[in-house]
Amino acid sequence: MTIKSLKDSTTHRSDDYASSPVVSTEPSYFANPVLPGFHPDPCLCRAGDDYYLVTSTFNWLPGVSLYHSRDLVHWESLGGILDKLDLRGIPESGGVWAPDLTYANGEFWLVYSVAKTVSGAFKDVDNYLVRARDIEGPWSEPVLLGAKGFDPCLVHAQDGCRLVLPQWDWRPLEGHYKFNGLLMYDLDVNTGKTGDPVRIFDHTGDTPCVCEGPHIMEHDGWFYLLAAEGGTGVNHRTVVARSRTVDGYYVPMPGNPLVSAAGTASPLIKSGHGNLVEGPDGAWYACHLCARRLPGAETCPLGRESALERIEWIDGWPRLAGGGSEPSAVVPAPMGVVAGTVTESYRPDTSYATSFAPAAISGARNG
């Protein structure tokens, strides 16, 4: 069986994690995705001058992939985080979902879901917390969190930690939509016990939809919520809301979404799900997942990948630096970072061909 090889026309690839920066004239740019291949559900974390990016691997080990950078452009793999993960019997597209990595009080904190089933009306999803003083471990024993939902988010507030979970409610009630909003709980990080839930957000727009993958950060006196809407297909998007208090309610940003490729010509389809960090030069960046199709096909053999976008703060809201919400294949690098010369077009290497139908490729890896 011969597998088709893909390559793009960039003269610099951000997946050359350990390579030295390419000498280039200013301004410098990098190509998206910064983590090509199977890197869904990205989450960025800054600790001092270091940046870490985690992605999920679903029903494959290591469960959570970990990368390190000092400039947001050149990334080095640090392996995985979860060394006590049992994925035996986990179905395809189950396993670890949407890791959320934060740094607070001198510790790294990771919350994540383990989905044991993905079929039927009810999903069995457990949520866990691990933490460590050093990003490379040792990590604590997993603490099972006492609230049901998926895609957990940990918020470090002055008066204690909060846990945020999107929640399903499958009761067959008339006029009831299955998604039950984003719920916030007080959390005892040592025992996993939670307080009573408070609904902090529903969705943007007038039509009910599932809102997932939440991340909350504090900036300039506001708490900002970033979340994913539109499912995981071509209508996927990142939306923003904010509140003066950590407990909400979070009000949607005018002109949502922040990032979406829906209805655009961007090669980075299915873009959405991510969070924000301040770069080494003071500029802000948003991470998000994306996927790239084969020309003339619906298939995305490399799965969902991780990308970065430049952000500007306008009237107290984060916006894409180029305007609109369309993700960019080429993005300005932080000032002083030499990332190389890139071009926007992605071309397949047609000297190879597949001997199997695209439908035979794993659906989860196709994104």
PLM feature spans:
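Carbohydrate-active catalytic/glycan-binding domains of CAZyme proteins
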Residues: M1-G367
